[in-house]
UniProtKB/Swiss-Prot annotation:
Gene: prmA
Family per record: Belongs to the methyltransferase superfamily. PrmA family.
Biological function: Methylates ribosomal protein L11.
Stretches that traverse the bilayer: none
Protein name in UniProt: Ribosomal protein L11 methyltransferase
GO cellular component: cytosol
Localization annotation: Cytoplasm
UniProt binding sites for S-adenosyl-L-methionine: T154, G179, D201, N242
Length: 313
């Protein structure tokens, strides 16, 4: 039976709060390890005295959830339970064994988004509909990184990119994919006519998956990947951020600064009911703000105001 595995780093001080949150949202098991294990800073814990609980200064917590759990829903529930904690660098993956992971990918089928965009697993034939001259075919191996097109948040972004391409607003444009996961959005944008793209993610596994998928699509020369702290400070004509509402709010200044005047932005990973706060948060920088809903998830899109009309956020 597969499980959804969550990992995070915390301190001895914040451990009880993280543990309470994980228990509240239904973690089936929680384990703790020294975050400095296998390094020169590893610290051995000897037999504790009576009434003492031995803990390291920094810990890596691992929690298991039912394999049918939605990682984004779990993360949203954790943020709602204790919004004062930093959930921005939580990692998720499906675990059991590599055979199960490959079996899941074998079940992943070709999908179409909008008029021209097709996501096709690397090990399957291109469907007949994707042979049209203007079709944008993305060959994908999602691996362990989030973003295969099957989740509503990703689908909302793919349809948005497709609509930009249809209206001619993606051709030759520069693209930032913040929270790139498997690289599906950056690669789709390039296939739809963007000139170059940058993928940013906190998870090194995501950057590896993005680079691998860029290679599968012969786009490695047009797609660069970075950890957030390493990303060059520059602006883009199109920015898409498929993360979560709390991170979108925190990063509003950063993301707004990445969009050129007149450029387009799409924000996804937003649960229905969270959109009003984000619309207000991004209004100082963006106009023509509108929402689209897919089940319980929302996408916000907008156009960057001209430089003379910007405000401080």
């Amino acid at each position: 039976m597969p499980f959804l595995e969550l990992t995070l780093s915390c301190s001895e001080v914040t451990l009880p709060r993280f543990q309470n949150a994980l228990d509240d949202v239904g973690a089936m098991a929680v384990t703790m390890l020294d975050a400095n294990a296998d390094t020169s800073n590893e610290r051995a814990l000897l037999e504790p005295g009576v009434g003492e609980m031995p803990l390291w200064d920094r810990l890596t917590m691992t929690a298991l959830f039912d394999g049918g759990s939605d990682a984004l829903v779990v993360l949203a529930a954790l943020e709602a339970f204790d919004p004062g904690l930093d959930w921005s660098q939580v990692g998720f993956r499906m675990v059991e064994d590599s055979d199960w992971i490959r079996a899941w990918i074998d079940l992943f089928k070709s999908m179409q988004f909008g008029a021209r965009t097709f996501i096709v697993p690397w090990n399957q034939d291109v469907p007949e509909a994707a042979n049209a001259p203007d079709a944008a075919v993305v060959r994908l191996d999602p691996g362990l990184a989030f973003g295969s097109g099957t989740h509503q948040t990703t689908a909302l972004c793919l349809r948005w990119l497709d609509s930009l391409a249809v209206s001619g607003e993606l051709q030759g444009r520069s693209v930032l994919d913040f929270g790139c996961g498997s690289g599906i959005l950056a690669i789709a944008a390039l296939k739809l006519g963007a000139s170059h793209a940058v993928g940013v993610d906190y998870d090194p596994q995501a950057l590896l998956a993005t680079a691998d998928n860029a290679h599968r699509n012969a786009l490695e020369a047009q797609l660069a990947v970075y950890m957030p702290q390493d990303e060059p400070v520059q602006t883009y004509q199109v920015v898409v951020a498929n993360i979560l509402a709390s991170a979108l709010s925190t990063l509003a200044d950063t993301l707004a600064a990445r969009v050129v005047p007149g450029g387009r932005i799409a924000l996804s990973g937003i649960l229905h009911g969270q959109e009003d706060e984000l619309l207000e948060r991004y209004a100082p920088w963006f106009e023509q703000l509108r929402c689209e809903r897919d089940d319980e998830w929302m996408r916000i899109e907008g156009v960057r105001r001209a430089a003379s009309g910007t405000q401080n956020g």
